[in-house]
Amino acid sequence: MKRMGLIMALMLAVSELFAAQTWKNETLRYTMYLGPIKAGEASLATKNIKRNGQDVVRMDLIARTTSAVEKIFSLNDTLTTIVNPKDAAPVYFQKHCFEGDDIVKERVTFSTTSDGRCSASMRKDYKDGRVKEKTATSKSQVYDMVSVVGFARAINTGNLYKGKRFSFKLADACEIIDEVLIYQGKEVVKINSKKFSCMVFRLVEPYQEKGKAKERDILTIYVSDDAQRTIVQMDIKFKVGSAKAKIIL
């Protein structure tokens, strides 16, 4: 359950998967369910602000579980990212999370090296006082758990076919990890008696097992196939069991 914060962040990040290239001041809200039980809520607020005299975009993700599910899992997460509105590249990221007994503070400072590589200077503070620090570089852009929306905005929806894959890199827990979004085709989804024709995407995490390449399912995303391109539902996979997150209409 400690990955719940990451999953909540990713599902909200891709909720602007097919948004316009302009950065709007707005707030998106979702409710999460375990079966019929309301498990929590999350919101992603986007604001255009000034930072050190420069125009930037600030995104704040807040995720909370309800008391009804806290014996199963609990989270109280606040994540903030600052991005460059011109290319959606992250500048700074911080995370303060309470997930069960785990209390974590993380921050990442992004920069560009002299040879054009993306550099991510990462720090993670544990509740017992331990500190982990690491700097990693990549030829491709590295995102944090919220600024990955910038990656999602760049996807061309005009050339989709079933099985098409979109790969990106994510800074999390002082590591750079690979994530993949796979287009699955179309489906009709019903939310509060309203039907949506949706494009379906599967988010997976590649890993190695006994020398063989495998993929771990994280969530399935249902995006309305209309001009709004709204994510109306996410099916979240755990090691045991699953949950659903539905848009608040």
Q: Model-found features: residue ranges?
A:
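Sec/Tat signal peptide C-region and signal peptidase I cleavage site
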Residues: S15-A19
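Hydrophobic, well-structured mid-protein blocks that either form specific transmembrane helices
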Residues: V108-R153
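Single-residue recognition of alpha-helix boundary sites
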Residues: A13-V14, T46
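Acidic, serine/threonine-rich low-complexity disordered tracts
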Residues: A20-S114, T157-L249
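Sec-dependent N-terminal signal peptides
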Residues: M4-A13
